[in-house]
């Protein structure tokens, strides 16, 4: 069964999650079986001030350099 009807997207840790991603279609076979649909709700929260802003820690976006490739697996390429 393909993830999100083939529209998988990369999430945190370069794991394939969600829909509306890179539009890869790893599984185009139809067997007539009943499938279960999952819904992933993503949201945006307001920025929060923190007393640790100047602590010297650096944060890197986990999804910066990956995209969903064949078989809904993440590849280390940027999806544009």
From Swiss-Prot:
The keyword Ribosomal protein does not apply. GO terms for molecular function: metal ion binding. Pfam families: Metallothio_2. It comes from the Eukaryota. Keywords: Metal-binding, Metal-thiolate cluster. Metallothioneins have a high content of cysteine residues that bind various heavy metals. Belongs to the metallothionein superfamily. Type 15 family. This is Metallothionein-like protein type 2, MT2-4/MT2-25. It comes from Brassica juncea (Indian mustard). The lineage of its organism: Eukaryota, Viridiplantae, Streptophyta, Embryophyta, Tracheophyta.
